Amino acid sequence: MRAVRTIDGEFGVVRVDLSDDNADGVVVDVVAAGICGSDLHMRTLGIQVTFGHEFSGRLGDGTAVAVQPLVHCGACDRCEAGQSHICRESGGTMYGIARDGGMADQVRVDPSCLVSLPDGLSVADACLVEPLAVAQHACNGVDVEAGQRVLVIGGGMIGLASVAVALAAGADVDLSARHRNQVEAGERLGAGTAASGEYDVVMEAAGTASAVAMAIDSVRPGGVVSIPALHWEGLAIPNGLQLTMKEVRLQYAFTYGHHHGEREVDQAAALLAVTPELAGAVVTHRFGLDDAPEAFRVAADRAGGAIKVVLEP
């Protein structure tokens, strides 16, 4: 079958056999797989697995599913506490990073990773469940609620997903984004533009030190800054004195787990089903699997208009 892997440090399509690492796994015929910014970062790391941790497809009986790609043991204290995303045994192991992922014709996954799709959610858009769950987890972690002023910094997928989650919670949401098409996507979702004054919650979804500094500047005294963005080069916290004097709480957010006894991927699927405008706002390009090299080139060109680029085997 076809699969997207790196060849001499570049993305390419190769022929591989379907992995049989998990004898109890179920085979998903992939319909859609999103390109994540982390995929672009990992291009030069020499990872020899099939890429893709944002994907959806169909089972052998035709059932449409999304996939929660995190692998966990289910038995450690973190898993038992509903924090399977920080499992002590698996440590963030994920399909598409440590195991063959969804940028392929088929992928074999553990049955516990399947996400049922609510009515109204198309399988072609269900690849957005995974990144939306990241935003769901970040907003859950800082208790975003109705009546709050929320600023989202960063107009990529996680930033726009955070806009959608915060709006669904009833917050008044503004977006600060670098590119015009990102601003327009935020407006389609209902976000305002960043304004003067202080915010109760700031979501830092840009992944830069300057964005963290802006977040600390913008949050009210006693407020909270959530950081769902990945800082690949590490982060020296800016504005440390202001951070202390305002008693700002920094809350990092990594992937997703459970909230009030429910998987956050299921919460994300439910939200996506009733927010069809999200897919329309963020999915800017769709490519066939054979065109993966061009799709990755487009995905890397944020200034050129790409937000979420999707591969469709």
What is the predicted function of each stretch?
Residues 226, 248, 275-283, 293-313:
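C-terminal capping/lid region of NAD(P)-dependent oxidoreductase domains
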Residues 235-284, 293:
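C-terminal substrate-binding/catalytic core of Rossmann-like NAD(P)-dependent dehydrogenases/reductases
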Residues 121-195:
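Mid-domain Rossmann-like dinucleotide-binding core that forms the NAD(H)/NADP(H) cofactor-binding site
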Residues 142, 184-249:
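Glycine-rich cofactor phosphate-binding loops and adjacent beta1-alpha1 units
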Residues 176-179, 205, 254:
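N-terminal Rossmann-fold cofactor-binding loop
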Residues 42, 73-153:
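NAD(P)H dinucleotide-binding glycine-rich loop of Rossmann-like/cofactor-binding domains
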Residues 19-33, 41-80, 113, 118-120:
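Glycine-rich beta-strand-centered segment in the early N-terminal region that forms part
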Residues 6, 18, 46-54, 94-99, ...:
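Short Gly/Pro-enriched turn/cap motifs at secondary-structure boundaries
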